[in-house]
Amino acid sequence: MSIKLLSLFHAFGESDSKILGSVEIINSQLIGTGACLPDFVLTNEMLEHMVDTNDEWIVQRTGVRERRIAKNMHTWELALGAAQDALADAKIDASELDLILVSTCTPDTNTPNTAAILQDKLGAGAIGAFDINNACTGFVSATDIADCYIKSGKAKTVLVVSAETLSRIVDYTDRGTCILFGDGAAAAVYRATEDESLGIQSTFVAADGSGAEYLRMEALPVEDPFAEDRTVDPKARFLKMQGAAVVRFTARAVPQAIDTALQRAGITADDIDWVVPHQANLRILDVIARRYHLPKEKVYVNMDRFGNTSSASVPICLNEMRRNGLLREGQTIVCTGFGGGLTYGAFVLKL
């Protein structure tokens, strides 16, 4: 078996040392993070004047107190700000990148993709740049792809950006959704390392399309292309969510994702220093802490200040933790995402 083929086995999750033999193992080390958050803050008190709700009701059910809204800002602008911040933190120039990945379910345009816009704005040169749309699991999925590129030798340095302007697709007359979501972007830079003790130790991503209707946002109307009246209902683009069904899915999917990632990394819950989950609902985050017998303070939470920012939530957390000195050398971090699709996943990161 060729060395190239062996590398591909490892890139796609094969961990059997008998198969890998003496092949050099390359890991994906996190070398920088960044974020870009809109200035405008939408508080629960402000929502009381827009929809039938109040601060106490929102906090008790979700944990959200305020969220950021991108007024007169494009998704690509948030993405660019986060990317520039991450590159500065990593102390590298965009010319050193081999690949740009953007996860978003709220792009400004279906084409061109947001990553291509970033490639130009950053001055990154002739490199690969593409978007993925995997809803709230987007950052975890993009990290998995970045790790595959690095492990296979196709890339040395990869920029992953998650950017969302969910306020565009939220119905502010629907108190079941408008209380949850916010806008924002964050980014991570991964670089190849030969140190097996650093970087991404394992990844896991999966989907359960049987729950597709639980979280849904129409892209293009299904209609007769030759119909005389092609008027589209303005509310057709709004996000629709069956909250109770999503919570039931999460209770099953998140432990499966984390357990699988831990198993693939060859570690147990006792080795975890931090869990960095998608910021969906405070009750869900409490369930994660209980499931893995972790103190609540070891499950990072910032959704009280930013709400649910879909794919951007995990990297926003990572950036905030890194800037506040909470991420330290030798720690083991588990990041997990879950949401529309339905999709779910996790990865283990060693610092």
Task: Tell what function each PLM region has.
Residues 2-72, 174-248, 252, 256, ...:
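Condensing-enzyme catalytic core mediating Claisen C-C bond formation in acyl metabolism
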Residues 31-34, 103, 133, 158-164, ...:
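Short beta-strand segments
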Residues 41-42, 111-113, 169-174, 344-348:
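Short acidic, glycine/serine/threonine-rich loops at helix termini
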Residues 51-58, 109-123, 160-166, 222, ...:
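Acidic-glycine-rich active-site phosphate/pyrophosphate-binding loop
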Residues 76, 80-83, 87, 106-107, ...:
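Claisen-condensing/thiolase-fold acyl-transfer catalytic domains that form or cleave C-C bonds
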Residues 89, 93-125:
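Anion-binding (especially nucleotide phosphate/pyrophosphate-binding) glycine-rich loop
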Residues 96-103, 270-278:
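Short glycine-rich phosphate-binding loop at a beta-alpha junction
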Residues 151-185:
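Flexible, glycine-rich active-site loops centered on histidine and acidic residues
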